[in-house]
């Protein structure tokens, strides 16, 4: 087997493992379908790892596709990332029994302090109190990425198809999206800190780290690969093979491998055990609520 065949075989194996663990976890939720509102959001989140793996694998198979094709593949991952962030917030709201539309703050937590960190303190007071307005603001900070990401993807694909896509537009859109996703993730962190006590039984930190880990690795390894290509560490030895294609290939291989670990981690973070009919803690909590 030549190196290309070994890479393709290894990537195929990784994708199969990622899909296996994810589908197994989804089937466990379906078989223990107790709280549809929560579990629908969880299933959408679980699908993130296999979708990233399959998307990257398609990029490896069609290694010599057009630039527009690869932009389309990246857009699928990133638009789904926006959906996952929105669903994660919806899941947290569901755990707290807070309406996304009404933004009603329960009396027992109204007035809690929210401590902002730099650079958010340039636009917000260092310390604010939780009320209807701040809860709505956190929701808007999350949803702006959900709206902006698909819009930017459509713009990028259209400009590339029309062959009007200078590098400065690419960098401008990249910066805008990075600021946007950072704000969305920041709002989720603030939301977690405000409701940490109430969310503790649901292991929100492990759930959030699962999402942030996928976003973090995919973004920063892309930056590192860009720097390595700029510094000449990644280079092409063939006239028919561009550095960009090699860089894209490395990124896709890494994503296929990483999604194996995230799909395994998801079995802990988004376990179906709390919804199992045999789960005693679930039964006790139901009795208390009654």
Question: What is each residue range found by the language model?
Answer:
Residues 14-17, 21-24, 48-55, 77-90, ...:
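Membrane-embedded alpha-helical transmembrane segments of multi-pass integral membrane proteins
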Residues 102-127, 275-290:
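Non-transmembrane, juxtamembrane loop and terminal tail segments
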Residues 193, 197-290:
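C-terminal transmembrane module of eukaryotic multi-pass membrane proteins
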Residues 4-21, 167-171, 198-199, 241-248, ...:
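Hydrophobic alpha-helical segments at protein termini of multi-pass membrane proteins
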Residues 22-36, 60-68, 86-112, 226-233, ...:
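Juxtamembrane interfacial secondary-structure elements that flank transmembrane helices
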Residues 36, 111-237:
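Multipass alpha-helical transmembrane domains of eukaryotic endomembrane proteins
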Residues 1-16, 20-82, 86:
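Membrane-proximal first intracellular loop
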Residues 10-17, 57, 72-79, 131, ...:
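Hydrophobic alpha-helical transmembrane segments of multi-pass membrane proteins
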